Amino acid sequence: MAVKKQSFMNGVFIIMFSQILIKIFGFIYRVIITNFPQFADEGNSYYGSGFQVYTLLLAIATTGIPNTISKLVSEKMAIGDKRGAHKIFRTAMCLFSLVAIIFALGLFFGAEFISINILKNPGVKYTLMSLSPAIIFVAMSAVLRGYFVGMQNMMEYSKAQVLEQIINSIFSIIFVVMLLDSTPEIMAAGSTLATTVAASSAFLYLLIFYNKNKKDIWNEVKKSEKFAVDSTKKIAKKLISYAIPISLGSVVVALSGVIDLVTVMDGLQKFGYNLETANEKFGILLGKVDILNAVPLSINVAFSVALVPFISAAMAKGNKKEAVGKINYSLKVSSLIALPCAVGLFLLARPIFMLLFPNAPEGAHLLQVQCWMIIFSVIAQTLYGALQGFGKIYIPGICLAIGAVVKYALNVIFVPMYGEVVPAVTTVIYNFIACSLAFICLFKYLKQKPDFKELFIKPLIATISMGFVTILVNKLLVYINIPNTVNTIITILAAVVAYVIFVVLFKVLKEEEIQQLPYGNKICKVFNKIKKI
């Protein structure tokens, strides 16, 4: 079949590599537009506020689609029912396209009401209107992505996302430059219009790929006619019954952002800031802190995406042991990603801000507070993917909802008292609560105790050791008056090298675990040479 299937770890690394590229392009354009004095933190506030509302509607309308379809399709593919898998795809395309159109129209025509009456920030209206058509294209792309991932083909999923981000980055900068003589809210709307352009391009790419392989797909479908095909109505009910609880987690995540929109802007004004200053302070969180924290989250999302179809297929074949093994391995790698990222951002927050935002370097202290959410959010991503793969689709949403309620209460009480540092703290608390509950639920279902030493303690020891090296290198370079840009880059590179060495020295990854990686044998040879040195 033309739609090629990849192994679990190859699929993970394809998605992971694409996410790294996406974040690189995302960083570039966000840093560029933030450094325009006309845009800066105020523009980021309008941009980020609009995106939070858009993300919420997108979560309700589309977020459960890829995982739902990949789960149902992978179950059919595991037993050879390619005809049933394709009917799931066709039904989903009709159903979710209709839902997306309704939400897009609601956002476009309700933009003024939302911005004035809910957000108390009238300038967000134009951002919401420019984002609304993107919901339709994202929904249709999500159906196609879910179909390909369900067949364990991660390549086209990843290519489409990279293409989308490249186009988004280019057009965002172009539109902002074209609108430099206008107000920050209009520039923010221009930048978000690029999202709609990019989403339509990604959908077109996936559609072309599907049509290119349509003949081969139909040939495979005809070979599986021995299977009974469910009715469209039955499939639609099944899609909705899975999509709603899977979306619930994403909806709650998006709601946590909206909680900040509703509580923080109002709280900052009660704290004593005027509307413009409150927008600037909130813009630091949305436009700087959030995008830096998002890097490790986007890299690790590969495990969440790949685990759902893999576990579903393994369970359909009655192979629970294999599924559990992949979960433990994924959790360990998630720890290896999250811990050094959090510590690195904490130690280098100020030099990183000076490097990336030379024209608007304020806010490093907020990153130092909020960066600890990375640990809990990254690990939680993997936990949610595992729970959904096992069919425990309501649990992630419930865990997140409990954390969101606590976050809302803390924001309402403490933002008017202590200002912009509060949402940074409550974001950490929110993710800690959700992650802890999901962890308990997963291992209770698996009926086994987690190996804390292997999963967390060894990666933590390697991370702490890396932290000492980071401090020493940075202090040394400051002492000999190396400029901040060169200092920061050298320190980050030294930290990465040190971390790899400590992972090898402390035997954080076993040889058989390394061999599961693409080019695992070659990596093992390199690690063995490091041990000898």
Language-model features: locations:
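Helix-loop junctions and terminal segments of transmembrane helices
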Residues: 63-78, 297-319
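Membrane-interface junctions at transmembrane-helix termini in multi-pass inner-membrane proteins
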Residues: 138-160, 372-402, 413, 417
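Signature of the first transmembrane helix
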Residues: 7-67, 104, 108, 134-135, ...
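Interfacial/gating helices of multi-pass transporter permease domains
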Residues: 33-56, 184, 188-192, 234-242, ...
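N-terminal membrane topogenesis motif
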Residues: 1-28, 83, 87, 226-253, ...
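Interfacial segments at transmembrane-helix termini and the short loops linking adjacent helices
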Residues: 112-130, 346-377
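Membrane-proximal transmembrane or re-entrant/amphipathic helices at the cytosolic face
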Residues: 472-533
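Membrane-interface helix-loop junctions in multi-pass transport and translocation proteins
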Residues: 155, 166-209, 394, 402-439, ...
